[in-house]
């Protein structure tokens, strides 16, 4: 009599790990001061990656492209042509 050794395949697929389940923390980018708001020198105006908004008058650009006020004054967000924006800080006139 013949004896057969049969090997059946698994009826259930092996369970792998999921590729979901992680999320990076927000970087808190964007405007930190509004148009027309009074700021002091050194105040952060806009946090960004790259130059989405360019520095204007009395505004500096940090190593991580953060825009900051160089003097005390009023913040103004302005357009440069059709597709560029800039932020400037204008000094407040001292009237008695």
From Swiss-Prot:
Which Pfam family, an example, fits this chain?
Ribosomal_L27
GO biological process, alphabetically ordered: translation
Spell out the Gene3D superfamilies in the cross-references: 2.40.50.100
Q: Which cysteines are joined by disulfide bonds?
A: none
Q: What are the protein's GO molecular function terms?
A: structural constituent of ribosome
Which UniProt keywords are present, listed alphabetically? Ribonucleoprotein, Ribosomal protein
Kindly provide the PTM information from the record.
The N-terminus is cleaved by ribosomal processing cysteine protease Prp.
Q: Which InterPro entries match?
A: Ribosomal_bL27, Ribosomal_bL27_CS
Propeptide feature ranges: 1-9
Q: Which GO terms describe its cellular component?
A: cytosolic large ribosomal subunit
Q: Which family is this protein grouped under?
A: Belongs to the bacterial ribosomal protein bL27 family.
What's the protein here called?
Large ribosomal subunit protein bL27
Species this chain originates from: Geobacillus sp. (strain WCH70)
């Amino acid at each position: 009599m013949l004896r057969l050794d049969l090997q059946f395949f698994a009826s259930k697929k092996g369970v792998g790990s999921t590729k979901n389940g992680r999320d990076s923390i927000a970087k808190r980018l964007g405007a930190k001061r509004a148009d027309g708001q009074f700021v002091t020198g050194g105040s952060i105006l806009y946090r960004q990656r790259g130059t989405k908004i360019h520095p204007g008058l009395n505004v500096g650009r940090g190593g991580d492209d953060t825009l900051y006020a160089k003097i005390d004054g009023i913040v103004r967000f302005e357009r440069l042509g059709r597709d560029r924006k800039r932020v400037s800080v204008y000094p407040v006139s001292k009237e008695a």
